[in-house]
């Protein structure tokens, strides 16, 4: 995905065109016509021919200085179409002068293969470097300042490519980055959900920067943002989050890179006629490019410095360098730069990192965006193909839903796209008809021979991929969009990775796009999700397929799509499943949402953090002995191990179906923002390998700035939660069927009242600390009056944790009651909670304790027992001290808990 550069002549203004014409006319007076006509064929004596456009053609069309550049001056003309028409007349290989350069054009797969194999591949392993790149992207500061896309072929290029491919674009590294890629894709799809939702809510009056009318999405803008967010996250560590007043680093970078992209689309005179570089100076183009380069340099430098400061801070705190410093590609580069053998190690401005970053960002966005746009356009114009794609996608996810090993039927992952062969065929066919780069450009670094013709060093090569991929000698019905061709025995093995020369959308040879795997995976993931989750229609009927001139193929008319969400129907629990849940021996209660919930659940929080093998075995044993309710959370880091245990329990037949289980999870405060709630739930579902959860909760009545989950929270990260928007996002999760019920945790009466003032769906559950040592009488009364179930945690006082207390298990009152009834103190505490009408979540890992916990339902506490328990001193254990700050929304425990502490 290296940057492609537009280097044919396209006047930047009428002044430039006039100046060039005047220079050409004056030059024709002093330059002998014969000299010009023989200019290209003045090669060393050789037995080979020289590939020259016919003398008659040159005589009638060529101009001094500019050569045949004027043929490509037409703003409405497409260079690949013009070259294709010339190939029809002059054959699959011909050449002509463009300014002061020689240009060789090849248009058949045989000629292209000859260019990109053997010794010729080495000869054509360089690229022309236009003025914009040299001026803006640091390519004018010597070889140690070149980026991967522009550095001449040689040892330094191999070193840089190794760094980029091994640390960012290899299949092994992409596996490590998968969760980051999916997270950013989820964020972008959440915005599509919001567009559909708001369009419905406002009866067609919803308009944002990415919409042009009711329900109509400007897909070009959305895909551009998605591509930038994905590559920006894995390269620079950019985080998506709510916008603040001042422009963020991400916004500054976007502005600078967009300005640079504009200059990259221009064609300075000096790119084709270096001796006329003064024209670019005269028009101010060079000056403006330099100004843009300085701006971009400052932004990228600040981003790299941010990473350096983070690394120093992490080392000062004694953090794990592998975890903290290898979060993105810049971190990896900085680690490598500390090694003495990396080129440019002594360069204080670290220009190689800047160049690589810009290469990755620039090259990683356009190909994905353009190919997806053309693919969607073709699908909208060929509804029968779209219908067949829907059938494949729907069938795959129906099968996945029924699978006992993986019930994540509503969540698309990279493993899914491997099985969707028709989706893969659609993308191949789209790239065949509309390659993002219709002409692949190279520069010969040495003399070579192609097709029997002598090609001097310094010749520009234009490989007309567009023409080659529409060759009727190779493709049946080459102008027809027919993905099924890639399902046939003859062509199903044809690949786009540069080995099949009849299909080269990513180029070939040594300079083939290094990010093929990344681009294909991302395109297939996005296309699959669009087809699975949305109905798509063109608001104007037939989509216009006109492309812009240039070496990158953009649509002239942006693509607008009318999107309607294909709502996932909430999974309705069957009466049989409810009976199975109750027959386990644990009573059930009906929530305000109408869903049935066991009153006793197993907690999965472990103080060691991530879920362990011990925990997986404990969950399996819990299911075996009768537990049907399991509580987890993103912050517990136990979702994955719970998902593994559920899948294994289904395999072993411990439960008949997933519907027999009640699974609750909870986001963390860093995701308590309107645009991150659905993303967080989807990530939890992916970890759990489930289609839905039964209960999804907010953890506290506060938000934190988006970032990693940690208890070491800087005071400046604590912010007030916007109850209205965050709860609306929770409601949308329930409406979409990703959760059956929604609830909160650690909310006081006052904060519940504030939340419900704007809620359409009231919280079904409030999960809070509750035990005989902290009885929550006021909160219980309020929740009962509002049909909110209190779900108790820390029922045993969190004994054994750093914040825990022996107030429950060490209580003399409870010990006496337990002794009198022949029960344990834990059983007495749990029975008391149950008799208050609350559900409870208790963590136990041994089989003995698991069975003991279940034996609380066939006996009762007396009135006298309740009176004695009511006299136990009260004290809160879970204080949430990390949310209290002099400058935050809660300046004291009293403000956080509203005097309920």
Curated annotation (Swiss-Prot):
InterPro entries: AKR (IPR020471), AKR4A/B (IPR044497), Aldo/ket_reductase_CS (IPR018170), Cyt_P450 (IPR001128), Cyt_P450_CS (IPR017972), Cyt_P450_sf (IPR036396), NADP_OxRdtase_dom (IPR023210), NADP_OxRdtase_dom_sf (IPR036812)
GO cellular component, one term: membrane
Biological process annotations from GO: morphine biosynthetic process
Key words, A-Z: Alkaloid metabolism, Heme, Iron, Membrane, Metal-binding, Multifunctional enzyme, NADP, Oxidoreductase, Transmembrane, Transmembrane helix
Amino acids binding heme: 513
Cofactor: heme
Sequence intervals crossing the membrane: 12-32
Class of the enzyme per the UniProt entry, highest EC level: oxidoreductase
Highest taxon of source: Eukaryota
Cell compartments where the protein resides: Membrane
Gene Ontology MF: a single term: oxidoreductase activity, acting on the CH-OH group of donors, NAD or NADP as acceptor
UniProt cross-references to Gene3D superfamilies, sorted A to Z: Cytochrome P450, NADP-dependent oxidoreductase domain
UniProt catalytic activity: (R)-reticuline + NADP(+) = 1,2-dehydroreticuline + NADPH + H(+); (S)-reticuline + reduced [NADPH--hemoprotein reductase] + O2 = 1,2-dehydroreticuline + oxidized [NADPH--hemoprotein reductase] + 2 H2O + H(+)
CDD domains listed in its UniProt record: AKR_AKR4A_4B, CYP82
Membrane topology term: Single-pass membrane protein
Catalytic activity, EC: 1.14.19.54, 1.5.1.27
Pathway linked to the protein: Alkaloid biosynthesis; morphine biosynthesis
PROSITE patterns: ALDOKETO_REDUCTASE_2, ALDOKETO_REDUCTASE_3, CYTOCHROME_P450
Family note: In the N-terminal section; belongs to the cytochrome P450 family.
Role this protein plays: Bifunctional protein involved in the biosynthesis of morphinan-type benzylisoquinoline alkaloids. Required for the isomerization of (S)- to (R)-reticuline. The cytochrome P450 module is responsible for the conversion of (S)-reticuline to 1,2-dehydroreticuline while the oxidoreductase module converts 1,2-dehydroreticuline to (R)-reticuline.
Protein name per UniProt: Bifunctional protein STORR
Record organism: Papaver somniferum
């Amino acid at each position: 995905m290296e940057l492609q550069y537009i280097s044919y002549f396209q006047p930047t203004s009428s002044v430039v065109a006039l100046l060039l014409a005047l220079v050409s006319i004056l030059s024709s007076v002093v330059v002998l016509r014969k000299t010009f006509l023989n200019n290209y064929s003045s090669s060393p004596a050789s037995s080979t021919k020289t590939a020259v456009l016919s003398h008659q053609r040159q005589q009638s069309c060529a101009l001094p200085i500019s050569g045949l550049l004027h043929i490509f001056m037409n703003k409405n003309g497409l260079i690949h179409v013009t070259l294709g028409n010339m190939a029809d007349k002059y054959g699959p290989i011909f050449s002509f002068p463009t300014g002061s350069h020689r240009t060789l054009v090849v248009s058949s797969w045989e000629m292209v293969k000859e260019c990109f194999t053997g010794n010729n591949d080495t000869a054509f392993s360089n690229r022309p470097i236009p003025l914009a790149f040299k001026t803006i992207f640091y390519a004018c500061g010597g070889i140690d300042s070149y980026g991967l896309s522009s550095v001449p072929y040689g040892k330094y290029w191999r070193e840089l490519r190794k760094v980029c491919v091994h640390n960012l674009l290899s299949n092994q590294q992409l596996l490590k980055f998968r969760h980051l890629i999916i997270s950013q894709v989820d964020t972008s799809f959440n915005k599509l959900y919001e567009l559909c939702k708001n369009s419905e809510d406002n009866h067609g009056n919803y308009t944002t920067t990415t919409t042009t009318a009711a329900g109509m999405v400007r897909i070009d803008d959305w895909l551009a943002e998605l591509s930038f967010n994905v590559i920006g996250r894995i390269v620079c560590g950019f985080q998506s989050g709510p916008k603040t007043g001042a422009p963020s680093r991400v916004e500054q970078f976007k502005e600078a890179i967009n300005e640079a992209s504009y200059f990259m689309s221009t064609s300075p005179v000096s790119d084709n006629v270096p001796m006329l570089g003064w024209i670019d100076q005269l028009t101010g183009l060079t000056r403006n490019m330099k100004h843009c380069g300085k701006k971009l340099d400052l932004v990228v430098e600040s981003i790299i410095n941010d990473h350096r400061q983070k690394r120093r801070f992490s080392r000062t705190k004694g953090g794990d360098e592998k975890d903290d410093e290898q979060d993105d590609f810049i971190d990896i580069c900085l680690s490598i730069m500390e090694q003495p053998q990396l080129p440019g190690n002594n360069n204080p401005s670290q220009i190689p990192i800047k160049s690589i970053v810009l290469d990755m960002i620039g090259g990683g966005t356009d190909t994905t965006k353009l190919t997806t746009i053309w693919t969607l356009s073709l699908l909208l114009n060929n509804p029968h193909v779209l219908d067949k794609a829907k059938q494949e996608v729907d069938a795959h996810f129906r099968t996945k839903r029924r699978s006992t090993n993986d019930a994540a039927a509503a969540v698309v992952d990279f493993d899914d796209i491997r099985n969707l062969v028709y989706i893969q065929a659609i993308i191949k066919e789209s790239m065949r008809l509309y390659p993002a780069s219709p002409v692949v450009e190279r520069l010969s670094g040495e003399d070579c021979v192609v097709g029997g013709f002598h090609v001097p060093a310094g010749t520009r090569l234009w490989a007309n991929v567009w023409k080659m991929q529409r060759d009727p000698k190779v493709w049946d019905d080459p102008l027809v969009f027919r993905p099924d061709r890639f399902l046939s025995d003859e062509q199903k093995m044809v690949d786009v990775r540069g080995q099949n020369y009849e299909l080269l959308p990513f180029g070939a040879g040594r300079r083939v796009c290094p990010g093929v795997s990344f681009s294909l995976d991302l395109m297939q993931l996005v296309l699959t999700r669009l087809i699975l989750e949305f109905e798509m229609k063109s608001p104007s009927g037939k989509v216009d397929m006109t492309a812009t001139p240039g070496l990158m193929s953009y649509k002239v008319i942006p693509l607008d799509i009318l999107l309607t969400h294909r709502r996932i129907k909430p999974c309705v629990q069957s009466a049989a499943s409810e009976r199975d849940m109750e027959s386990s021996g644990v009573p059930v209660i009906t929530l305000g949402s109408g869903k049935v919930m066991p009153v006793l659940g197993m907690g999965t929080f472990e103080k060691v953090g991530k879920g362990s093998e011990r925990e997986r075995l404990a969950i399996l044993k819990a299911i075996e002995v009768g537990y049907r309710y399991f509580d987890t959370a993103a912050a517990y880091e136990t979702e994955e191990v719970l998902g593994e245990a559920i899948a294994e329990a289904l395999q072993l037949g411990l439960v008949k179906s997933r519907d027999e289980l009640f699974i609750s999870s909870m986001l963390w405060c860093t995701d308590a923002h309107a645009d991150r709630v659905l993303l967080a739930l989807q990530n939890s579902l992916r970890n759990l390998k489930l289609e839905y959860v039964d209960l999804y909760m907010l953890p506290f009545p506060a938000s934190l700035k988006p970032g990693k989950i940690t208890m070491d929270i800087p005071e400046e990260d604590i912010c007030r939660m916007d109850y209205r928007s965050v709860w609306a996002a929770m409601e949308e999760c329930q409406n979409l069927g990703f959760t059956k019920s929604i609830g909160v945790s650690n909310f006081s009466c006052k904060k519940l009242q504030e939340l419900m003032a704007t809620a359409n769906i009231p919280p079904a559950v409030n999960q809070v600390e509750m035990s005989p040592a902290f009885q929550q009488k006021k909160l219980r009364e309020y929740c009962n009056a509002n049909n909110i179930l209190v779900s108790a945690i820390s029922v045993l006082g969190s004994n054994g944790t750093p914040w825990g207390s022996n107030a429950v298990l060490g209580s003399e009152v409870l010990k006496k009651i337990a002794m009198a009834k022949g029960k344990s103190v834990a059983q007495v505490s749990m029975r008391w909670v149950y008799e208050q009408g609350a559900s409870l979540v208790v963590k136990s890992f041994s089989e003995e304790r698991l069975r003991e916990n279940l034996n609380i339902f066939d006996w009762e506490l007396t009135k006298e027992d309740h009176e004695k328990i009511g006299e136990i001193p009260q004290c809160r254990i879970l204080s949430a001290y990390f949310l209290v700050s002099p400058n935050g929304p809660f300046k004291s425990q009293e403000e956080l808990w509203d005097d309920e502490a």
